Regions:
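Ubiquitin system architectures
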Residues: 2-89
Length: 89
């Protein structure tokens, strides 16, 4: 049974940082993506323009890239999942 939040390990190779973050399972992946990216960059004092800088969320163990309009609960993201945030070029 899934609660309303899961704890995932977020990995940002572009800034060499990793964080464990709770995310709501009822939100769409694009919204979770933007919120996490903004929070991580703000915590590190790095300016980011979310309109210009785009990131994709990729499952580290499976290589699956999550599409934007899928609720987290409908993905394979569960407690302990490692998600790599890759900057799009």
């Amino acid at each position: 049974m899934m609660k309303n939040k899961v704890i995932v390990k977020t990995i940002f190779p572009s800034i060499d940082k990793e964080y464990d973050i709770k995310i709501p399972v009822n939100e769409l992946s694009w919204k979770v993506n933007k919120l996490i990216v903004k929070a991580v960059y703000d915590m590190n004092g790095i300016h980011i323009d979310l309109k210009e800088d785009k990131f994709v969320m990729m499952n580290k163990s499976t290589g699956k890239i999550y599409t934007n309009n899928v609720p987290i609960i409908d993905t394979d993201i569960r407690n302990g999942t490692e998600i790599v945030f890759l900057r799009e070029t």
